[in-house]
Swiss-Prot record:
Keywords noted in UniProt: Membrane, Mitochondrion, Mitochondrion outer membrane, Nucleus, tRNA processing
Pfam (any one): tRNA_int_end_N2
Function: Non-catalytic subunit of the tRNA-splicing endonuclease complex, a complex responsible for identification and cleavage of the splice sites in pre-tRNA. It cleaves pre-tRNA at the 5' and 3' splice sites to release the intron. The products are an intron and two tRNA half-molecules bearing 2',3' cyclic phosphate and 5'-OH termini. There are no conserved sequences at the splice sites, but the intron is invariably located at the same site in the gene, placing the splice sites an invariant distance from the constant structural features of the tRNA body.
Annotated InterPro entries: tRNA_splic_suSen54, tRNA_splic_suSen54_N
Further details from the record: The tRNA splicing endonuclease complex is present with 100 molecules/cell. Present with 531 molecules/cell in log phase SD medium.
Gene that encodes it: SEN54
Topology in the lipid bilayer: Peripheral membrane protein
Single biological process term from Gene Ontology: tRNA-type intron splice site recognition and cleavage
Name by which UniProt lists this protein: tRNA-splicing endonuclease subunit SEN54
Length: 467
């Protein structure tokens, strides 16, 4: 029989074992942190006390019970928490069906630095893949609206909140969905992407503008191009055939293999700036249907400008191997794609860093560096002389500490040429949702001496020393 007082915590019992249990509970260390956080109004938030780690099962259900209580507390906290977004930070995007684009009436966010195009009214227009990407990451709320604009008299009933399933159903084709998957994957990695068919306000190109030739010059150039065979003259074209082996005698095996250069017809791969410019001038006479590349890709950097992005670092072509409407590019189409490349060619030894690219790229048929200097002339005149001197000293200090391209030995340079090639682009192959990136590059194995030449003189000297 037990008796408990109303004003005291003392408990009397006739069982002596109960007193021993009470003494053990008093000796245990009690955790008052949770109770103190409830009592104190200004108490700092802290993690609850954790128990001792069990290194092996103890044969009871105590561990399962502790895990169940912990997971239940977590799910109860999540389910009972207040969900929503701050009205001030909410950004709504409206899908425009007849343009297959989206518009943000009140755009704000860091994504505006690399995505979208602003119009004169201050509204930001997004491509559909940009719209889906921002909605998928939770940056904007997607709405369906028949007429989007700055009309304030539009009713709220015309705005329908779209789910991700609704957005995916708005893709016009499987090819567009494949392009979005590649776009979203590279954006999550931090790259900056723009469609290849979307020109910036300031177009930068590695090649200067072509001068229009007269009809007589065009006809003459076309006739001469017919007789141009891999840097061989017209008179040596006869020996560019199997008859070469009848008119010339070969006494050694190396001569025979070297003669294959004239027998096997190959393609001249541009290896420097001059050859690139010559190949671009010959491209206007090719009558091959161009396959446009899909994306221009820039490495992430803080000075990127949508109006003047500069030359891209990579160019990507998206191909779905399971789509019957698409096909892998043929040899002629690949040749045309290589000739249409316009990016920062990494194999050029004449260009060592980004500053050299500003000099070797063109905007409106003038070097990009000169164009930037003219554009910033107005802002420079407004600056004081002291700030101009400080900026000049800063630029000279940066140029003096500029790292140049590392020089490699000849055999390593040859391995790099054989491995990476020259002009290149990336093919993003879609296979049932899986993306594989394959680098397609031009190589010139025929001009590289890949055979081994033993140094017999050293072996003879070593044998002579032994004897």
């Amino acid at each position: 029989m037990q008796f408990a007082g109303k004003k005291t915590d003392q408990v009397t019992t006739s069982n002596p074992g109960f007193e021993e249990e009470e003494e053990e509970e008093e000796e245990l260390q009690q955790d008052w942190s949770q109770l103190a956080s409830l009592v104190s109004k200004n108490a700092a938030l802290s993690l609850p006390k954790r128990g001792e780690k069990d290194y092996e099962p103890d044969g009871t259900n105590l561990q399962d019970l502790l895990l169940y209580n912990a997971s239940k507390a977590m799910f109860d906290t999540i389910s009972d928490s207040i969900r929503g977004t701050t009205v001030k930070s909410e950004v709504r995007g409206y899908y425009v069906p007849h343009k297959h684009q989206a518009v943000l009436l009140k755009p704000k966010g860091s994504f505006m630095q690399t995505m979208g195009r602003a119009d004169s009214t201050g509204e930001l227009w997004l491509d559909f893949h940009e719209f889906v990407y921002l909605a998928e990451r939770g940056t904007i709320l997607p709405y369906y609206r028949l007429e989007a604009g700055s009309n304030k008299s539009s009713k709220h009933e015309t705005e329908i909140l779209l789910s991700m399933e609704d957005l995916y159903s708005l893709f016009s084709s499987q090819q567009e969905m494949d392009q979005y998957f590649v776009f979203a994957h590279l954006k999550r990695l931090g790259f900056i992407l723009k469609p290849s068919n979307q020109e910036a306000a300031v177009k930068t190109s590695f090649f200067p503008l072509k001068k229009q030739r007269s009809n007589l010059q065009a006809i003459t150039w076309r006739l001469l191009s017919l007789f141009k065979i891999q840097e061989l003259s017209l008179f040596s074209g006869f020996f560019y055939s199997k008859w070469n082996f009848f008119f010339r005698k070969y006494t050694t095996s190396p001569q025979l293999y070297q003669g294959l250069n004239r027998l096997v017809r190959s393609v001249a791969v541009p290896k420097n700036k001059k050859e690139l410019l010559d190949a671009q001038s010959d491209r206007e006479f090719q009558k091959v249907k161009d396959i446009p590349l899909t994306f221009k890709v820039w490495k992430p950097h803080s000075n990127f400008k949508k109006r003047d992005p500069g030359l891209p670092d990579f160019q990507v072509f998206v191909y779905n191997k399971n789509d019957d409407l698409q096909h892998f590019p043929t040899y002629k189409e690949l040749r045309s794609m290589f000739s249409s490349l316009d990016y920062k060619f990494e194999f050029l030894s004449e260009i060592e860093d980004d500053d050299d690219w500003e000099t070797n790229s063109y905007v409106e048929d003038i070097p990009r560096k000169e164009y930037i200097h003219k554009r910033s002339a107005k802002s420079q005149t407004e600056k004081s002389e002291s700030s101009m001197k400080a900026s000049f000293q800063k630029k000279t200090a940066q140029s003096s500490t500029k790292k140049k391209r590392k020089a490699y030995p000849p055999h390593i340079q040859q391995n790099r040429r054989l491995k990476t090639g020259y002009r290149s682009f990336i093919i993003a192959i879609m296979d049932n949702g899986l993306i594989s990136f394959v680098k397609m590059s031009e190589a010139d194995f025929g001009s590289e001496s890949v055979w081994y030449t033993p140094n017999t003189q050293k072996k003879v000297d070593q044998r002579w020393k032994k004897h």
